[in-house]
């Protein structure tokens, strides 16, 4: 009897990878999040401790504010850049894209340290303006993750729809809001997902650039794990996972919009 190879067997390594490096770690986090550190028994003590401490709530809110601000700023800067690159000649396009990708080849910590030195040199570092310095670092590190998906989406835009909107009497603003944005919505959603979610858990940028004046949620998680308080650290990590899941559900709502529905009405 010959063994018939089926294509479904190709998914086995992928399934094993997900089980070992996604499902099992999440289950471990959930286990530690709802067990007492001293007794090992099931407990909601970490839930109570988290919401009873105002500092935890403040850090969570600050992290969400920075994540939202970083996403908005990256979109405002990255969208026109991606649009310009998508309308450049192919040779110039490749060179400019390379210039934006090149910093990503440098180690994340090295890039952040270089940003700190630059801000200090121009008088904006050293903890003088921690909020501004942190935002600069976040935007610098995550801007390429906005430009690349937007650029890829814009290259696939149907230019005839843009021309048709002008032929039908639409002005530039109407064409942008009613035609271009709907066609590039998949890229916008992808960009927001790739920036907002990592920013929530980021802590190296805020620690280095704000001189530890800005404490984000990721810093708190790192603090508790370094103190060997795995249980409370796991509970905070679980909260972060829930927030990321909520953001994914929100962005999926927009990603389901068909970009071909662009119109003037």
Q: Whereabouts are the PLM-identified features?
A:
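Short, Lys/Arg-rich, polar N-terminal cytosolic tail immediately upstream
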Residues: 1-5
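Membrane-water interface segments at the C-terminal ends of transmembrane alpha-helices
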Residues: 6-38, 53-155, 183, 187, ...
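Short hydrophobic, aromatic-rich alpha-helical segments embedded in or entering the lipid bilayer
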Residues: 39-52, 212-225
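Short glycine/proline-centered loop/turn elements that form peptide/ligand docking sites
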Residues: 157-161, 259-260
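The alpha-helix within a helix-turn-helix
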Residues: 165
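Glycine/proline-centered hinge or cleavage motifs at structural transition points of membrane proteins
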Residues: 168-169, 182
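Short cytosolic juxtamembrane segments of multi-pass membrane proteins
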Residues: 254-265
């Amino acid at each position: 009897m010959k063994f018939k190879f089926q294509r479904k067997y190709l998914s086995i390594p992928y399934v094993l990878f997900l089980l070992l490096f996604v499902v099992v770690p999440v289950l471990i986090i959930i286990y530690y999040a709802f067990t007492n550190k001293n007794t090992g028994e099931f407990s909601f003590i970490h839930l109570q401790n988290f919401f009873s401490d105002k500092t935890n709530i403040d850090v969570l809110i600050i992290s969400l504010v920075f994540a939202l601000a970083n996403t908005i700023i990256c979109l405002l800067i990255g969208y026109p850049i991606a649009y310009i690159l998508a309308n450049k000649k192919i040779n110039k396009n490749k060179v400019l894209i390379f210039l934006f990708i090149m910093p990503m080849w440098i180690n994340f910590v090295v890039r952040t340290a270089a940003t700190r030195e630059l801000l200090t040199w121009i008088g904006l570092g050293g903890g003088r303006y921690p909020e501004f310095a942190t935002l600069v670092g976040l935007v610098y590190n995550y801007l390429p993750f906005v430009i690349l998906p937007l650029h890829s989406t814009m290259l696939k835009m149907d230019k005839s729809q843009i021309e048709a909107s002008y032929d039908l009497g639409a002005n530039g603003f109407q064409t942008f809001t009613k035609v271009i944005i709907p066609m590039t919505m998949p890229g916008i959603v992808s960009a927001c997902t790739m920036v907002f979610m990592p920013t929530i858990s980021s802590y190296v940028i805020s620690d280095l650039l704000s001189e530890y004046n800005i404490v984000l949620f990721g810093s708190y998680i790192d603090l508790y794990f370094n103190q060997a308080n795995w249980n409370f650290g796991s509970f905070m990590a679980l909260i972060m996972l829930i927030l990321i899941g909520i953001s994914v559900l929100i962005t999926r709502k927009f990603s389901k919009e068909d970009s071909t529905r662009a119109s003037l009405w």
